[in-house]
Design a protein with these regions (language model features):
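Intrinsically disordered, low-complexity regions
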Residues: 1-145
Length: 145
């Protein structure tokens, strides 16, 4: 598995921006997911007492990534949790639709035992892009914090 992400301090002043990349679309999704998880809290300080299964479908992989990363912000607020990890599976159906199946793991927010970082409120369309070049996928994402 080969994915990466890098936070970009010079891109967004009041928000948090990152670039993610992967050798496949699956790896791009995992890298971008890990970037959001890492932006919220140090995953090494988060347990796995909470779990949520998420299924999503979209024709456009860029729209699917945007919606999925938005789901992370939603579940953080709706369940009052931060995440230790997410197992993400992505595949293209015969119909052409992209299907994401993910399992989020985490636990309720507890500042006394967790290294909390940014309060991510959502994903913005500002500078958002997903592209593929020579078999390598890349995304730029700006998070509203």
């Amino acid at each position: 598995m080969s994915y990466s992400y890098q936070f970009l301090e010079e891109v967004a002043v009041a928000d948090l921006a990152f670039d993610a990349a992967g050798d496949s679309l699956q790896e791009l999704f995992q890298g971008a997911t890990n970037a959001v998880i890492d932006a919220l809290a140090n995953p090494a300080t988060i347990g796995s007492t909470w779990m949520q299964v998420v299924d999503r479908e979209e024709a456009d992989p860029a729209a699917l990534l945007f919606d999925w990363l938005s789901d992370l912000a939603y579940w953080k607020d709706a369940a009052g949790v931060v995440f230790s990890k997410a197992d993400v599976t992505l595949r293209q159906e015969q119909s052409g639709l992209w299907k994401l199946q993910a399992v989020l793991y985490g636990e309720p927010v507890n500042p006394s035992t967790q290294e909390l970082r940014a309060d991510v409120k959502g994903v913005t369309k500002h500078l958002y892009r997903v592209s593929e070049q020579n078999g390598r996928w890349a995304a730029r994402v700006v998070l509203d914090v």
